[in-house]
Regions:
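Acetyl-CoA-dependent GNAT
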Residues: 1-51, 60-67, 98, 116-121, ...
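Conserved glycine-rich acetyl-CoA-binding loop
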Residues: 43-61, 79-87, 91-92
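Residue-level signal for secondary-structure boundary sites
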Residues: 84, 121-122
């Protein structure tokens, strides 16, 4: 995302921004829109030198815990070529529900994925705990 896009997020009532930091260093972030009972992960990233160390999973679990009881499902779009992210999302319980042809500006397709939560705010068949994202 561009700096301008991030700055615009701060003016949206339905936009939530999260930062994952370790020892004062920002190593990841997420932007989530909550509209009614649905949380859409608009953007999520972990610094490349931290890939494969569980930070993405920790951040995703934190998001699910944070929105428990507030939403009935999560939705996200992911590049078809981003196998690492797709596997992460599937390991947490996300399912591919559709393919969006030419979704990205470079023409790449996207998968739309969802995680359905139970009415009590829990997810179906998985147990998550909150994680400390810094400080």
């Amino acid at each position: 995302w561009s700096r301008q896009a991030f700055e615009k997020e701060f003016n949206l009532d339905y936009s939530y921004r999260f930062v994952l930091e370790e020892e004062g260093e920002i190593i990841g972030y997420a932007v989530v829109w909550q509209i009614y009972d649905e949380a859409t992960i608009m953007s999520i990233a972990i610094k490349k030198d931290r890939w494969g160390k569980g930070y993405g999973k920790r951040l995703m679990k934190f998001l699910i815990e944070y929105f428990k009881g507030k939403v009935s499902r999560f939705v996200l779009d992911v590049r078809r070529s981003n196998i690492r992210a797709i596997r992460l999302y599937q390991s947490i319980g996300f399912k591919i529900i559709s393919e969006r042809r030419g979704y990205y500006s470079d023409g790449e397709d996207a998968f739309q994925m969802t995680l359905e939560l139970e009415e009590n705010g829990g997810d179906k068949g998985k147990a998550f705990e909150a994680v400390n994202t810094g400080g």
